Every structure is written in structure tokens, then in C-alpha cells.
């Protein structure tokens, strides 16, 4: 069957596009632009909600950043190994110039960022963000120049970007690793050893390597090391038989896998990452975000640090004779490529997500990355488009006094950077004015046209999820599923589950308890503080109806305590209560027989009259417990307590008065407080007791392990009725 030229033309156009060098960068740009548009459209909420839709144990955003990006790093590892063994990096002379330039491009941006953020340890964690180069974006921009850019420059940029990626992988593995699980890490090492043995035994089928790579990813993901490192490790174990002079040889497993992954990664994996992480909302932004040291550190690190670091290191290497300048490329063109190295979209955002757990810091990171990358792309492209190839074969920077082009290039650098400074200042002022105009005119959603002229104001980060634990009920042992109570045995498991969420910056605890057993109260308090220290998380406590006596003791575990104005808070005292039946047995004709081997063994027997010495002994115990309670309050509320003589008398107050006395930190509700702290997109995740295979709740909040059996309920019915009466009495003290 014959096809007309018209029917074949669309297919050939698409094929030419997919095969072009610029295709990957253009696709990534389009994905990022689409994310900006969607995030500022009526579909914005659907976009953000979809990213946090849970699929199995992880949200969609985590699947993209932890699993899908492992495939990207697998391809990066394959490219690094191929280039080192059978490509541009196979010989030391070829490695010198891009290697030295890459080192300068990693070190100087990190120094600029550290200088601006040295006094803030939390922000300093992002020192590596401006050190990365996005190979797809940078090569995409360079490819738009066509024949204006000599092939030697493209090889130089590609090689430099690969070494830059290698540095980023090492940085992620060393500096952005969470707490280590040695069993999983050991299993990962064993799996890597299996891959190594297969390589040494000349196993050439890909399937065993791919299966082992998936297993390796699982172990690395659970070990605490970032899961994307598994992709690089697996890539380095896949065999490549060097074939000098035949870089396109497709006989080795590495070549086959690299060829199979190239287009899916370029046109599926990386664009999905860009679309998922480049969503920007322009609503409710302050102009001061652009002036924050975190944003400026990344912006200046990418735009200035990269170009000065890469070009300065390359110039020094060429001047000292360690390397040669790319053939046919002028100094201006080499400087233009150095500017393009400041495009750090994919890898910079990825490191930023690892560096900062909070929504605000991730937002500032993305603003800095986009601004620095955009400036680098525009300025680098314009400079390369205006430059002429091989303008200075005589090395103008080497012989500045002999070549007029050297003087012209020096003047150009001065004018270019002065213009860059003026442009940056002007853009900042324009953005501040635009932000003020948007707030006055409420045109936050009428921005698609401005995207072409203004640097975006906000990248919407993956929303923060805060685990929520409900501690509701009286504090005593022996609770059941029908009558839940609080004790260490019933709360330990659910607390550990909440604090184990490694992505959450804090744990929220809802308390509604009138108190109860002081020992159980202190044990729960201690467990919360120990878990917070172990996992380095903040604890926010929110009081509902009441946090009194032992309930307030548990609330002291919070770094901040928030209550409703009508909540009941306080009752810092100790009470003991029981029933006395000294005349009951006589009336019903029952004789009670008690045998002891100690004179004080029947202290406070409810069937005997009270003794003065027994009451004094009980009050002495109460004073000791009360003193411990007071010490806890003074320690946890140091510098916040008011001067009130009734503070430790056992009185209780409303939330409003408790705030003025320093017993709590503020008034409000959980959702409003957490939105103010972590941003509007914060998500609350209620931690539920674990369920068995048949869906029945396992022992958790308020129940003992055997509390669900009807026979046990019947057997302990008498005790249960007394406990219910005691519990009702505790609640009744506060009118509840």
C-alpha cells in the first residue's frame, strides 16, 4: 500500500523531533510550563491533591521522587560508566578540562550559598542545591544554536554535566542520608555483591541484573540512604565490554539498556518529575520571599557561582597547561557554556526536596532554582548566539597585552556583569511591584501572560503531612474496646508509628483527658519526649475539652501547647479517692477475715475505719508526687509561667486564662496552627491502631491485648463497673 508524502510528513516530523538533541530539553521545559499553568488554573487543587494521593505505602509524589527518579539515576550511572570506559572520559587528557571545570562549578556555588546562610544551620543544609547542572536543559539550550556552537563545545558541556551528575550522586549518598537501618543496609550490600559477582562471571542477560536492581532499590529505600543511589550502584555493576572506536556498539548489556532507557527517561521520567515538582501558585505571596537568603543563595550560586566557577577553573587549567581549550571554540563561547551550567532545574530541585522538610523552605528553594536557571539559560543563549567561533586562536586571556580581542573580551565581561547586576535589581523591584499590584487587584489567576515576562514567584512544594495521634480518655490501666483508657501499653505502639514517618517534620497530638494514674501519665510523657529526641521531630499538643492533672502532664511533652479558649487546663495537683464500707459487712452479716505479715499491710482498707497515721502516710506520698509534677511543669514551661500563687494548687482554668498564666503557648485549633506553621497545603494524617489480617483492630489506644473477648468482659464485669464509676468521677470534677 502506497502512502502519500502528506500522510508520511507528520510521522517524519515527530521522528525528527524525538531524535533531535534539543527534544529532551524542550519536553522538560514544556512540562514545567504546563505545571505552572495548571497550578494557577481552576484545576490547581486537583493537581496538588493528585500528587498526595496514596498508592500503597507512598504518595504519588514520593513514588515519583523515590522510585521513578531511580530510573533516571540508573541512566545517569550507565552514561557515566560508558563515558569512563569507552567514551569522552576514557583518557585522562579528555577528563582534565571538564573535570576541573566541574569541580569549580560545584565548589564556588556552595561557597556563595554558605556565605549567605552561614548563620542559619537549617538553611545551610541546602548548600549543594546550586551545585548541580541539568544536562537535559543545558544541552537543549545549546542545541537551539545549531551550527553556531562547535561540536567540541557540546562534547565539553555533556562531559562536564555527566561529571556534575556524578558529584551530585556522591553528595546525595554522603550528606543527604537519614538515619541508617543496618539490617536493610547490610541486605543492600549483599545484593550489590550479587550484582558484582554476576558481572565478574560474565553474565550478559539483562533480566537478572534488572531483578537484582529492583531488590537493591527496596533495600536501599528502607535503609535510610536515598533510594536513587540504588540506580547508580546497579548501573555500575552492569557489564560493558570496551569497544574502542565503536561507541555505538549495541552488543553489551550496558549499551542495550542505555539505548532502551534513553527516550523513556527523556520523554517520560524527567518530564513527569518536572511536572510534579514545578507547580507554582501565585496566590498570597509576599515580595520578601525573593530577598530571603535561602532564595538569594541559590539564585546567585547558580547564576554567578556556576559561571565563575566553571569558567575560572577551565581558564586556570588551560593557562597552566593542564588542559587544552575545546577545538574551534572561542573564549566567549566557552564563557557562554559556563553560564549555561547554571541551569540546575532537575537535580537542584531534587536536592532541595532532600534538604528541607518544610513547605516554606522548599518554596524558596524552587524560586531560587527557577530564577537562577532562567537567568542562566537566557544570558547563556544570548551570549552564545552573538559570539563568533574561534575569535581568539591566540588565547586572548593568555596574551592580553598583545591581542586587542583580549581587551575587548575583558571589557565585555565587565559590561556584561554590570548589566546583569542592574537587570537583577530591576527585576526584583518589578516583581515586588507586581506582587503589590496582584494583592490589590485580586488578579492572581490572570497570570499566564505575565509568565513570559516575570520570574515566577512561587513553586508549590509537596505538601507537608503531619501525623496526628489522639490521646482521649482517662489515664488508667485495664481499658477495653468498650471503655478505652490511656496507658503506656495502649499508646506506645501508635506513638512509635507516628514518629516513624521519616518525611514528617513534626507530630501533632490531640489530648482530651481529665487525668488519672500519675505513673502512666509520666510514662506516656517520657515516651513522647524520647521518641521526639530519637527521630528529631517537633511535638505540637492540641487540647480539646480538657487537659487536666495527668492529662496536662502528658501535654507537657509538647514543644508547643495550643488550646481552645473554652478548654479546661491545669489542675496541677494530686488526688486520691476511694470508697469506705466499714459498717456494710456488719449489716449484711458477713465476716471479713484478713491475715497479714506486716503491721501496715492493710493500710486504707475500705472495710476498716480510717486511721490517722494511714492518712498522713498517704499525704506524704501525694506531696512527693506533687513535687515531681511541679518540677516537670517548671522544667518544660521555664520562662513562660506567670506569677500566680494558685498555679500549683490544683485549680484549673479556661484556655484563655491558661495562656495568660503561661500554662499553654496559644489559642487556636490544630488545622489553623499547622497551616500557619507549614503552609496552606499541610495535610493531617490520623494514625490508627494497627489491624490484623481480618481487619480487626490489634491492641492499641485504650485496650489491653485480650480486651475484645466476651468471656473476659464478663469475668471482669465487677471490676469494670467500679472503674467506670471511678472514670465518671474523674470527668465530673471538670463538669464533663
UniProtKB/Swiss-Prot annotation:
PANTHER family: NA(+)_H(+) ANTIPORTER NHAA, SODIUM ION/PROTON ANTIPORTER NHAA-RELATED. It is found in: Cell inner membrane. The gene is nhaA. GO terms for molecular function: peptidase activity; sodium:proton antiporter activity. InterPro entries: ClpP/crotonase-like_dom_sf, Na/H_antiporter_dom_sf, NhaA, Peptidase_S49, S49_SppA_C. Residues 1-387 are annotated as: Na(+)/H(+) antiporter NhaA. It comes from Brucella melitensis biotype 1 (strain ATCC 23456 / CCUG 17765 / NCTC 10094 / 16M). One of its GO terms (cellular component) is plasma membrane. Its main location: membrane. GO terms for biological process: proteolysis; regulation of pH. This is Na(+)/H(+) antiporter NhaA.
Amino acid at each position: 500500500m502506497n502512502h502519500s508524502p502528506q500522510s508520511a510528513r507528520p510521522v517524519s516530523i515527530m521522528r525528527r523531533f524525538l531524535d533531535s538533541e534539543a527534544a529532551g530539553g524542550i519536553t522538560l521545559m514544556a512540562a514545567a510550563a504546563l505545571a505552572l499553568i495548571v497550578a494557577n488554573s481552576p484545576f490547581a487543587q486537583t493537581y496538588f491533591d493528585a500528587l498526595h494521593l496514596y498508592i500503597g505505602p507512598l504518595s504519588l509524589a514520593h513514588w515519583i521522587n523515590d522510585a521513578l527518579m531511580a530510573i533516571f539515576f540508573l541512566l545517569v550511572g550507565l552514561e557515566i560508566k560508558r563515558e569512563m570506559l569507552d567514551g569522552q572520559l576514557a583518557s585522562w587528557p579528555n577528563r582534565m578540562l571538564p573535570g576541573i571545570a566541574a569541580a569549580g562549578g560545584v565548589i564556588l556555588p556552595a561557597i556563595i550559598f554558605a556565605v549567605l546562610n552561614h548563620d542559619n544551620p537549617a538553611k545551610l543544609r541546602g548548600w549543594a542545591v546550586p551545585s548541580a547542572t541539568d544536562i537535559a536543559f543545558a544541552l537543549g539550550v545549546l542545541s537551539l544554536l545549531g551550527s553556531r556552537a562547535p561540536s567540541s563545545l557540546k562534547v565539553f558541556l555533556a562531559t562536564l554535566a555527566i561529571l556534575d551528575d556524578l558529584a551530585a550522586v556522591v553528595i546525595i549518598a554522603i550528606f543527604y542520608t537519614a538515619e541508617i537501618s543496618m539490617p536493610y543496609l547490610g541486605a543492600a550490600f549483599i545484593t550489590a555483591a550479587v550484582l558484582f559477582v554476576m558481572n565478574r562471571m560474565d553474565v550478559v542477560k539483562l533480566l537478572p541484573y534488572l531483578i537484582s536492581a529492583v531488590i537493591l532499590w527496596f533495600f536501599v529505600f528502607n535503609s535510610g540512604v536515598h533510594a536513587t543511589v540504588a540506580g547508580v550502584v546497579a548501573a555500575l555493576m552492569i557489564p560493558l565490554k570496551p569497544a574502542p572506536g565503536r561507541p555505538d556498539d549495541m552488543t553489551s548489556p550496558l549499551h542495550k539498556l542505555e539505548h532502551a532507557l534513553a527516550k523513556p527517561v527523556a520523554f517520560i521520567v524527567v518530564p513527569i518529575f518536572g511536572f510534579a515538582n514545578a507547580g507554582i501558585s501565585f496566590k498570597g505571596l509576599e515580595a520578601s520571599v525573593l530577598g530571603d537568603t535561602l532564595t538569594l543563595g541559590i539564585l546567585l550560586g547558580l547564576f554567578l557561582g556556576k559561571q565563575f566557577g566553571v569558567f575560572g577553573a577551565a581558564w586556570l587549567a588551560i593557562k597552566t597547561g593542564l588542559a587544552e581549550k575545546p577545538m574551534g571554540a572561542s573564549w566567549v563561547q566557552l564563557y557562554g557554556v559556563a553560564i549555561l551550567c547554571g541551569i540546575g532545574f532537575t537535580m537542584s530541585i531534587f536536592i532541595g526536596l532532600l534538604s528541607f522538610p518544610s513547605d516554606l523552605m522548599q518554596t524558596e528553594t524552587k524560586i531560587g532554582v527557577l530564577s537562577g536557571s532562567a537567568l542562566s539559560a537566557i544570558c547563556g543563549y544570548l551570549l552564545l548566539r552573538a559570539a563568533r567561533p574561534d575569535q581568539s586562536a591566540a588565547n586572548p586571556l593568555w596574551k592580553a597585552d598583545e591581542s586587542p580581542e583580549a581587551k575587548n573580551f575583558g571589557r565585555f565581561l565587565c559590561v556584561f556583569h554590570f548589566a546583569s547586576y542592574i537587570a537583577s535589581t530591576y527585576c526584583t523591584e518589578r516583581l515586588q511591584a507586581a506582587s503589590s499590584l496582584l494583592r490589590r487587584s485580586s488578579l492572581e489567576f490572570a497570570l499566564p501572560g505575565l509568565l513570559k515576562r516575570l520570574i515566577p514567584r512561587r513553586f508549590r512544594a509537596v505538601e507537608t503531612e503531619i501525623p496526628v495521634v489522639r490521646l482521649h480518655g482517662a489515664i488508667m490501666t485495664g481499658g477495653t474496646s468498650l471503655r478505652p483508657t490511656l496507658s503506656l501499653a495502649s499508646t506506645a505502639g501508635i506513638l512509635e508509628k507516628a514518629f516513624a514517618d521519616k518525611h514528617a517534620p513534626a507530630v501533632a497530638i490531640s489530648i482530651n483527658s481529665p487525668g488519672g494514674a500519675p505513673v502512666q501519665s509520666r510514662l506516656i510523657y517520657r515516651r513522647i519526649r524520647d521518641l521526639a529526641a530519637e527521630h528529631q521531630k517537633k511535638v505540637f499538643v492540641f487540647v480539646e475539652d480538657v487537659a487536666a492533672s495527668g492529662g496536662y502532664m502528658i501535654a507537657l511533652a509538647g514543644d508547643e501547647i495550643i488550646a481552645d479558649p473554652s478548654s479546661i487546663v491545669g489542675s496541677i495537683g494530686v488526688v486520691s479517692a476511694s470508697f469506705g464500707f466499714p459498717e456494710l459487712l456488719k449489716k449484711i452479716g458477713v465476716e471479713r477475715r484478713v491475715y497479714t505479715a506486716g503491721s501496715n499491710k492493710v493500710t486504707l482498707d475500705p472495710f476498716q475505719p480510717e486511721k490517722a497515721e494511714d492518712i498522713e502516710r498517704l499525704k506524704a506520698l501525694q506531696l512527693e508526687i506533687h513535687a515531681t509534677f511541679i518540677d516537670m511543669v517548671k522544667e518544660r514551661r521555664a520562662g513562660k509561667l506567670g506569677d500566680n500563687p494558685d498555679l500549683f494548687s490544683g485549680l484549673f482554668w479556661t484556655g484563655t486564662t491558661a495562656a495568660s498564666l503561661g500554662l499553654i503557648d496559644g489559642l487556636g485549633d490544630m488545622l489553623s496552627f499547622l497551616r500557619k506553621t507549614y503552609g496552606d497545603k499541610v495535610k493531617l494524617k490520623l494514625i490508627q491502631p494497627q489491624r490484623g489480617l481480618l481487619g480487626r483492630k490489634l491492641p492499641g489506644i485504650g485496650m489491653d491485648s485480650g480486651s475484645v473477648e466476651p468471656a473476659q468482659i464478663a469475668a471482669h464485669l465487677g471490676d469494670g463497673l467500679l472503674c467506670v464509676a471511678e472514670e465518671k468521677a474523674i470527668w465530673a470534677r471538670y463538669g464533663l
